[in-house]
From Swiss-Prot:
It comes from Haemophilus ducreyi (strain 35000HP / ATCC 700724). Belongs to the UPF0756 family. It comes from the Bacteria. This is UPF0756 membrane protein HD_1071. PANTHER family: UPF0756 MEMBRANE PROTEIN YEAL. It holds the Pfam family DUF441. Keywords: Cell membrane, Membrane, Transmembrane, Transmembrane helix. InterPro entries: UPF0756_TM (IPR007382).
Length: 150
């Protein structure tokens, strides 16, 4: 079995280097795993990852967010805390961001060309500004507001 060299493979190598230089494990690990998948017999699973990867990632992210509550490190708020202005603002922002993410998925589905620009911006944000890869959905949601698309 010989390695296949192609533009996507070189792009993934560049992402790995950016991840290492930017000290960002998430981009380094993600790009490395995708490169290994692309260059080996695991490439047959890439369509499945493409289809379900975002859903699986959101599930894992949600588990990570909820685990401090389950472990007891964060207590559920009492009624007076739920009724505070900070909690109301947090709930409102959560609703707004979830709504933006939904708009983002719709925009990415209807205008796939935009995905390239959003991914490049997200990669730069991850590699150099300490961001995390939830950016494309929110960025696409903001983009949908700016271009007026659902």
């Amino acid at each position: 079995m010989s390695l296949q060299f192609n533009p996507i493979g070189l792009f993934l190598v560049a992402l790995i280097l950016l991840g290492v230089l930017g000290n960002n494990n998430s981009i380094t690990i993600s790009a490395t795993l995708l490169l290994l998948m692309q260059q080996t017999a695991l490439n047959k699973y890439i369509p499945m990852l493409e289809k379900y990867g975002l859903t699986i990632g959101i599930i894992i992210l949600t588990i990570g967010v909820l685990s401090p509550i389950v472990s007891g490190k964060i207590n559920l708020p009492n009624l007076s805390e739920i009724l505070s202005w900070k909690m109301a603002l947090a709930i409102s922002i959560g609703i707004f961001v979830a709504w933006l993410g939904g708009r983002g998925i719709n925009l990415m589905a209807t205008q796939p060309l935009i995905i390239t620009g959003l991914l490049i911006g997200t990669i730069i944000g991850i590699a150099f500004f300490g961001g995390i890869p939830v950016g494309p959905l929110i960025a696409a949601g903001i983009m949908s507001l700016l271009v007026g698309k659902l």
